[in-house]
Amino acid sequence: NMHHFEYHNGKLQCEDVPIETIAGEVGTPFYCYSHATLTRHFNAFDEAFADVDHLTCFSVKSCSNIAILSLFASLGSGMDIVSGGELYRALKAGVPAEKIVFSGVGKTTEEIMYALESDILMFNLESPQEMLALNECAARLGRQAPMAIRVNPDVDARTHPYISTGLKENKFGIDLEIAESMYAQAREMSNLDIVGVGCHIGSQLTEVSPFLDTLKRLKLLIESLRKEDIQVKYLDLGGGLGITYSEEDPPHPTEYARALLE
């Protein structure tokens, strides 16, 4: 059991505090989060990758409550953001900018400028147009923008079609074939600093194999980039492992890490 929500004598409790008691104090409706559960989950991931230089990031879009973001910040978590508002919240919550990755489609010029001025870790780019926009914004500020391209590895995540993002027919990310030429273009742009390769193959993944397929394909890409003398520092692997809604049996983070590190 990975969480701290339990029934005692038919009454739901969170970390041994009856939900009824909380309702009596704060009124209903309310959200009740268990810090102990979130801490345990974060540590499970973070410790699983202890043997390699890594950054475990929380997806801010999944819960942008500043109290929760502050908890993760105190644990040393990074943040994966998809908007200027999420960047504002992450910084407000005490997350260092060098632990923030800006993903997502449709980043506005204002958001890009704000993220550049904040000195975030990197931008995950989703299109050639976005690459031009990032280069332009960085030129305006006279700096190098750290970037990765979100590659679509054409892997079936075997998840629900509504939340699958890594197949060729899915609209997200850049096809592997195109990614290489995009990296070559990026290298010619004066205000881009190529630092990574990213991907996000879906949500609610309950098997390790789609991640392994993805990793194999991204390794090939990284190797051919190295031949072109493009040195990639970061490999951004997404999305997260699934959770047990009913019958699912997702792998434990340690199994996930072991498989990837092998």
Which sequence ranges carry the predicted segments?
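Conserved anion-binding
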Residues: 118, 127-193
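Structured alpha-helical segments in the cores of large, soluble enzyme domains
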Residues: 41, 152, 176-193, 218-232, ...
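Glycine-rich tight-turn/loop motif centered on a GG-T
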Residues: 24-31, 117-123, 161-174, 207-211, ...
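A charged N-terminal "starter" segment
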Residues: 1-145, 189-193, 220, 227-230
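Conserved radical SAM core fold
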Residues: 65-68, 86-88, 109-111, 153-168, ...
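Short beta-strand segments
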Residues: 59, 146-152, 198-200, 236-238
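C-terminal active-site-proximal or functional interface alpha/beta core segments in diverse enzymes
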Residues: 203-262
